[in-house]
Structure formats: structure tokens, C-alpha cells
């Protein structure tokens, strides 16, 4: 469906309108408030930048509110990418709240405005995680056929947080591929609504 120009235009138009409304109605006061809280709670920058893979494997810079201590590393002692996990000591007290409520992802609306992310789509993974997964997970690279999103079908179906096993990642990718194959505008709206519901309900995999 997203190989059709009119569908891409519809999705892009929605992304721009939705993001602008977010910044005007919510971002104008949420961003300054969170910036102050983050700066007062721990040393380090307000925003966290990370290289991730976007459409057609293009490297993009993904923005988030910093939720970990400045000195934290995402590479373990064996040189492998270390995902955030439950009770992760790298995460600050404020960071736990931000991640639990998805508020750490809010700066990605800027990514949406500039066009390298969408409101809805497969979540973009860090470079190291892509490299680890592409050899182990069937059809993994096909998830990069569309622009990645802030939220996605996999996330509203419980595939959030750490992917401890290859099977966990395969399940996430299967949801991503289903989304790509079955995309329609109403599916995006359903995912957005379910994301909001999950935020208020709480997600045990959000950490």
C-alpha cells in the first residue's frame, strides 16, 4: 500500500499536521518543563541522540529525552549492544518515569517534521542492534521498506522493551511486516489510539 504515491502523500500530510498540532498544543509547555526536570535530576544534556536505521537502511539521528546517566554506555563488556532492561541501573529515577509513559520519545516528533520518521511505523533500531539482528531474524531488513515510526503495531501488541531472544525480535518483525503489507490510514489511527490507551493503562514491558 505505501508503494502508492497517493498513500505516501496521505501519510506524510497527516504526520506534518499531527506533529505541528503536538508542538503547538502540548510541546510548547511540556518540553520546557521536562527539560528543567531532567537537568535538575542528573548531570548531562537534556536530549539524547542516537544513530538508527530509517527508510532503505539510511542512517538517521533519532532524538529522545535523556533517560540514562551521562556516563552510561550501550555497549557491554563483550562489545555487544546492550538494550535497556528491567531495573537497569543506567536509567535515572526521572528516566524511569519518562520511559514508562513514553515521554522520552516526544522529541521524535521533530524527526517526523523533518521527514525521517512517521508517527506510526516500525520502530527504528540502533545500528548495533540492526547488525546483530539482520543475520539471525528472517526478513529483518524488509522492515526498512517504510519510514520508521514513533509507535507501531508491534508496540501496541506488547512487543516493547528488551528483545531478550531471537524469537522476541522475530515476533516484533512479523508485526512490522504485517503492518507494511496491510497498511491503511485507519490502521494508523487505531495504533495511535491504542498507544494513548496503553500509556494511561501502563505497559509492563515499558522500562
Regions found by a protein language model. Name each.
Residues 47-90, 151-172:
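Short, glycine-rich, amphipathic interfacial segments at transmembrane boundaries or analogous
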Residues 73-76, 121, 204:
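Short amphipathic alpha-helical interaction/hinge segments
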Residues 26, 83, 87, 99, ...:
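Aromatic-acidic/polar surface patches that form glycan- and anion
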Residues 6, 114, 137-207:
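C-terminal terminal-structure detector
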Residues 20, 45, 55, 96, ...:
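Gly/Ser/Thr-rich helix-start
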Residues 3-71, 111, 185-207:
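A hydrophobic, helix-centered structural microdomain
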Residues 84-147, 191-199:
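A short, structured surface patch at a secondary-structure boundary
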Residues 34, 48-49, 120-122, 127-128, ...:
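Short, hydrophobic secondary-structure boundary micro-motifs
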